Amino acid sequence: MLEVTATSAGIMLFRREEAATEVLLVHPGGPFWARKDNGAWSVPKGQVEDGEEVSACALRELEEEIGSRLGLTAADLMELGSVRQKSGKVVHCWAAERDFDPAELHSETFTMEWPPRSGRQQDFPEVDRAEWFDPDEARRRINPAQAELLDRLLASLDGS
């Protein structure tokens, strides 16, 4: 039987403040993630749809998760490659230099039964918050597999 690998695409936003680089990470919404912090944060990303270009998915997911594409197009994106998360999901990622005010976060929502077996459907945001982190703090907060994407970004910026 052919195994289908889940594939996501996302964008690691970064900004440079004087000599320091910061990256924007998002925290997933919903009750499962409510009390999780270190290792729970992520680049804004989501599932690639059938027939969708991977970079187009990354831009769409940025808008769905933070509420804006920030004027980005595929031409603005710097490829960081892909990583495989513990779940087996492959995450393709790009980087882009843009500023974003986390207070402007407007995420799409999803519906799930909560509490379990209650028969009650509730809406939750895909992302409940976004924050800028310096590289050391980002490394503590980000999904462990995605830390490699952060390292690739920093290496690329050091070489530029």
Kindly give the residue locations of the regions a language model identified.
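N-terminal strand-loop-strand
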Residues: 1-43, 94
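Short, charged/polar surface micro-motifs in flexible loops or helix N-caps
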Residues: 17-20, 30-33, 49-50, 87-88, ...
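Active-site-adjacent beta-strand/loop module that shapes the phosphate/pyrophosphate-binding cleft
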Residues: 81-119, 131, 153
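Alpha-helix-centered segments that form part of catalytic cores
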Residues: 120-136
